[in-house]
Amino acid sequence: MKPLVIGETYRTQGRTIGEGDVSLFAGLVGDFTPIHVDETFAATSPHGTRIAHGPLSMSMAIGMATLTGLFGARVIGLVNINWDFGGVVKLGDTIRAEVTVEALRPSSKPGRAVATYGLRVFNQTGAEIQAGRMVVVVRAD
């Protein structure tokens, strides 16, 4: 594993959110809120169409960050997550993320450290739509 470097930023590839993603997520978590699954209802909303669940796009951003090799085998467990949903993700939108190593400190347990990651999520126009922080227990490098 490449050592974590405070201030280093990783950029993910993009991923387009589709019908299957929203349907599967709704079924998995049991959230069938009309704004996500009912186009007729959603057409009358301020968004004019259905939007993806906020936690779906957050989870996809974290998953895309995992594909950079930043997390993987080094992760022991999630301590905390704090997330802001500043914009919506419509079906057909493509999101990407940037992840920055913000802090790294030793854990009280040998061989472990506590890493803080800042994440920013952007849509296909480059607008920031979500941002958050994750605190994760990791294997010490």
Predicted regions mapped to residue ranges:
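Catalytic strand-loop segment that frames the active site of acyl-thioester-processing enzymes
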Residues: M1-A52, V138-A140
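HotDog/MaoC-like acyl-thioester-processing domains
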Residues: M1-I6, F85-D141
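Aromatic-residue detector
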Residues: K2-L4, I17-V22, I51, M60, ...
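A generic structural signal for short beta-strands and their flanking turns/coil linkers
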Residues: I6-E8, Q13, D21, D31, ...
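Short, surface-exposed, polar/charged, turn-prone segments marking secondary-structure boundaries
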Residues: D31-F32, D38-A43, G63-M64, V79, ...
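Hydrophobic beta-strand-centered segment that forms part of the acyl-chain substrate-binding groove
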Residues: A43-A52, L56-E102
